[in-house]
Amino acid sequence: PAGLQLGGAWGLILGSLLTLVTALALGSGQIAGPGHWVGGSRTDAGGLFLLGWSRSGGDLRVPHFFATHIMQALPIVGLVFDVVAPRLVSAGLLAAGTLSVTVVAATFAQAVAGRPFF
């Protein structure tokens, strides 16, 4: 199916690029700074249930999580469009890709500003 192939290709491209960017930010903090924390307490105690993301300051693991999972989300979106609306595969994937990049950029900016995800 075209949507699955296109979603897989764009998922790998966008997901890899954004994961690399967020991983570099995480890695630089591990060496020269406070790790994945930005502001707030430097502990995972009291973090968000199941994920452990900081609730007192920014956490660079949040945008990294969303960037990594673009690789799985876009092929699924493409497959759904293949089944539900094959004529809208390209437009649907463009919208999903744009939304994904926006979510990663917004959560990255939020983390760098020292604001918690929740």
Q: Model-derived features: where do they sit?
A:
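Interfacial segments of alpha-helical transmembrane regions
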Residues: P1-L18, V89-G97
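Membrane-interfacial catalytic/cofactor-binding modules of polytopic membrane enzymes
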Residues: L26-I70
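Interfacial helix-loop-helix junctions of multi-pass membrane proteins
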Residues: G29-G33, T107-F118
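Membrane-interfacial alpha-helical segments at the cytosolic side of multi-pass membrane proteins
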Residues: Q72-A85
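Membrane-water interface at transmembrane helix exits
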Residues: T22, L26, G78-F81, A106-Q110
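Polytopic transmembrane helical bundles with strong interfacial aromatic enrichment
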Residues: W10-G35
